[in-house]
């Protein structure tokens, strides 16, 4: 989708492994900007994928759109196909889905996990996350004793990677752009509502300790 009057671009790029998600790199590594160099505008990535990961990466020159989609309160879901080794057992998968404490002391939110392939030596999973911490999935897996050998993002909100080939991109449809905006707005509204409810609960007066209700229960 390209908004002609302001020349705003909204792209879905298949980031290959080996590319960094920055505008430039002082170490001389390949950047995703090389893959969209034919676009006559200064684009920037919406979010990130680390160098060894691949898959869907949104690109735009619309700052408000990028901020809305990447803001933590938006909570837009992202679908990843993750291959780990050795084989993941049930307890490890349960820990990952319930949330784990990372090396910096922060705890990840619960996430949905669907096992695609389970065989000796490796497991392939689909993981749906709403967070975007740096190298989050790799760090989550390391915490439970698993090594990520391949990580591919297949979807972000309503946008699917589909049949894109590594290193190529397509324009988002207007429906996809609007769908991402709507999902981000809904997430922000839910976050605000939860915060207000929490504050209301804190302000609610409590009865004397040991006071009994009408049914005699404390």
Tell where the protein language model's regions lie, with residue ranges.
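Basic, flexible Lys/Arg- and Gly-enriched helix-loop patches that mediate nucleic-acid binding at interfaces
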Residues: 1-218
């Amino acid at each position: 989708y390209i908004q002609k009057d302001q020349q705003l671009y909204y792209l879905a790029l298949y980031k290959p492994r080996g590319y960094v998600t920055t505008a430039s790199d002082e170490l001389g590594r390949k950047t995703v900007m090389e893959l969209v160099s034919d676009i006559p505008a200064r684009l920037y990535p919406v979010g990130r994928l680390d160098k060894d990961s691949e898959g869907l990466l949104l690109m735009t020159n619309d700052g408000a759109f990028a901020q809305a989609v990447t803001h933590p309160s938006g909570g837009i879901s992202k679908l990843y196909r993750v291959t780990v080794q050795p084989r993941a057992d049930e307890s490890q998968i349960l820990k990952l889905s319930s949330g784990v404490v990372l090396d910096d002391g922060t705890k990840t939110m619960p996430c949905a996990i669907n096992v695609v392939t389970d065989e000796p030596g490796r497991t392939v999973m689909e993981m749906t996350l709403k967070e975007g911490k740096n190298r989050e999935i790799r760090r989550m897996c390391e915490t439970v004793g698993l090594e990520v050998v391949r990580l591919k993002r297949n979807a972000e909100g309503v946008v699917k990677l589909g049949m894109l080939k590594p290193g190529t991109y397509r324009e988002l449809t207007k429906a996809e752009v609007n769908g991402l905006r709507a999902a981000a707005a809904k997430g922000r509204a839910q976050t605000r509502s939860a915060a207000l409810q929490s504050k209301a609960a804190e302000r609610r007066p409590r009865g004397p300790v040991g006071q009994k209700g009408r049914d005699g229960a404390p």
